Design a protein with these regions (language model features):
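Short, well-ordered coil/turn elements that cap or connect secondary structure elements
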Residues: 23, 57, 120, 154-156
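Residue-level signal for inorganic ion chemistry
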Residues: 47, 118, 130
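N-terminal accessory targeting/assembly segments
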Residues: 1-108
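Canonical P-loop GTPase G-domain recognition
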Residues: 124, 134-168
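Structural and coupling elements of P-loop NTPases
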Residues: 2, 45, 95, 122-123, ...
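Histidine-anchored nucleotide/phosphate-binding helix
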Residues: 109-119
C-alpha cells in the first residue's frame, strides 16, 4: 500500500496511508535493505510518497521511497570545504518565505538563499512581508523595503505584504 510521510524523527516515520487503504496512520521504520542502499540525505522525509507494508495494527515498514517531484535541501558544511546536502522536505508545491518589514528588518540575503534552495528543488518560491503596518511609509527604512520588494517582483518572485493588525 502507498502512503505519505507526515513526520520523520530519529528513524521513525509517521505515514498516512492512502484513503483507498483506510486513511489511517502508521508508525514505520525503513526496511534494513533500504537503509543500506540509500545515503543519509536520501532517506524518507516529510512529504515523500512511500510504499508501506503493515506489520501490525499501528506499525509498518517502508519498502520504497517513490520518485520525488520537488524538494528542499539544506547545505551543511563538511570537512575540507566539502558540503553535504541535507534533504528537509519533499514534494512541495510552494515555499512561502516570511520576513518582517521591521523589528527585525527583512534580510534579503537570507531570502535569496531560500529562493535559490527552492529553485534548485523545483519548488515555486514566494515572499510574504509581515508587520507591514509597523513601518511608516515615510520612514527611511520604508524606501529600502519598497526597493527590495520591487526587485523581487521584477525577477518574478510573488510578494505579499501582510499586517495582522490591519488585516492587510
Amino acid at each position: 500500500m502507498q502512503g505519505l510521510v507526515l513526520r520523520a524523527v530519529s528513524g521513525f516515520f509517521t505515514v498516512r496511508v492512502d484513503a483507498a487503504e483506510g486513511g489511517h496512520t502508521l508508525t514505520c521504520k525503513l526496511r534494513g535493505k533500504l537503509k543500506k542502499e540509500r545515503q543519509k540525505s536520501e532517506l524518507a522525509v516529510a512529504g515523500d510518497r512511500v510504499e508501506v507494508e503493515r506489520t501490525s495494527e499501528t506499525e509498518g515498514v517502508i519498502d520504497e521511497v517513490l520518485e520525488r517531484r520537488s524538494w528542499i535541501v539544506r547545505r551543511e558544511p563538511g570537512p575540507r570545504g566539502k558540503h553535504f546536502d541535507d534533504l528537509v522536505v519533499a514534494n512541495v508545491d510552494v515555499l512561502v518565505i516570511c520576513g518582517a518589514a521591521t523589528a527585525p528588518p527583512l534580510q534579503p540575503g537570507l531570502v535569496d538563499r531560500f529562493l535559490v534552495a527552492a529553485e534548485l528543488g523545483h519548488v515555486h518560491g514566494m515572499l510574504a512581508v509581515t508587520k507591514r503596518d509597523a513601518l511608516a511609509d515615510d520612514a527611511p527604512e520604508a524606501a529600502t523595503l519598497r526597493e527590495t520588494i520591487a526587485t523581487y517582483r521584477r525577477i518574478g518572485v510573488p510578494v505579499i505584504e501582510t499586517s495582522a493588525k490591519t488585516g492587510l
